């Protein structure tokens, strides 16, 4: 069995760092840097076993085609604009995702990543996420209630089983900026109908009682009776005095599942948009492929 990268399956991490970057010059330097980075991660995992450290290095479409010789990751593509511009594309070449129970360990690993990749990349965005009270989003609603639980279930959803891509996963990242003042002008019942869950108790509102534009209705999708699931590794980010929101991060064995949710949220299926756009907006968007550890070492 191919070994999946260690940042894909963990649950309930306390903190994370995401780094998106473009390649500078020859991709051969990226090959070697990626190998060095995964070795560094293993060293930190051995040094800080209590941190439950995980990490991922993933690649955008153009760079992955160069690294892989065009083999595999057939669904991978550049992130397009959705909803006639409501969801912008900020596609980059490389994604580094670090998560654990200890922010200081994450930061040390991020420093090691910068040393490993060096001049091979140009960092375009770096976001530090944190687990908030009761695993809630900054909106006050519990985040990720429908997230698959347990390693076996999460592996089934997130990890490609067979073929040249075995052990790999498609990654989607999208940073959302909240307007909490706008949210707090709404009554709690209105907020609950917008999300599709009660705020305090986190109970699902029945489908025939909540609007079709509620967030839950837009993303709880089924085909042939089977849910289009993704494994989420999202966390709040930001400052109390400035910009804050949710850094959405999801892994899936099929990019299809992720894209169907996006098409539904931004009105590209039936013209109806996710009601949570009343108080929050996406400002970035990227698709990546995270190969197995064996495939990274064979680049």
Kindly give the residue locations of the regions a language model identified.
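Long, histidine/aromatic-enriched segments associated with O2/redox biology
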Residues: 1-299
